[in-house]
């Protein structure tokens, strides 16, 4: 009499491996740019924090600071460069970059147009 074996055949195992490979091929590109999204979020967050620091400094001294270390004691996130700040009469703008994102920067303008995207709203950080 013939006994039945319990377990999977080689074909069944190969089909499972192929299906897992297809699912991985679909999922990996969706998560590939997760790091760059995190870097952009850090740059935007730093610009929002800079708005708070600048306006706080302005309320104390009636001028906007251009030196983030001395005047405001502002420290950017890891990998984010110290923002470049330009001040005007009652307005200022700033841009920053990240060490892991080449040819990419974020900017913000307060009481003036955004230095990167002129259609951005007042105080809205935009990356390009």
Give the predicted meaning of each segment.
Residues 1-2, 56:
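Short, contiguous, well-ordered secondary-structure segments
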Residues 2-31:
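N-terminal single-pass transmembrane signal-anchor helix
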Residues 12, 41-44, 121-123:
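Compositionally biased non-globular segments, especially hydrophobic aliphatic-rich helices
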Residues 17, 44, 51:
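Conserved catalytic core of two-component sensor histidine kinases
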Residues 30-47:
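Aliphatic-rich helix starts adjacent to a transmembrane/signal segment
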Residues 48, 52-128:
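Periplasmic/extracellular, small/polar-rich flexible segments of pilin-like filament-forming proteins
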């Amino acid at each position: 009499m013939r006994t039945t074996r319990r377990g999977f055949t080689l074909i069944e195992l190969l089909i499972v491996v192929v299906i897992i490979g297809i699912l991985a091929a679909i999922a990996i590109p969706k998560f590939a740019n997760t790091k760059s999204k995190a870097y952009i979020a850090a740059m935007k967050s730093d610009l929002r924090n800079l708005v708070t620091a600048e306006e706080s400094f302005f309320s104390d001294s009636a001028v906007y600071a251009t030196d983030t270390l001395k005047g405001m004691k502002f420290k950017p996130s890891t990998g984010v460069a110290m923002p470049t700040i330009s001040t005007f009469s009652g307005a200022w703008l700033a841009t920053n970059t990240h060490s892991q994102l080449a040819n990419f920067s974020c900017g913000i303008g307060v009481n003036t147009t955004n230095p990167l995207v002129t259609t951005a709203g007042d105080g809205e950080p935009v990356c390009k």
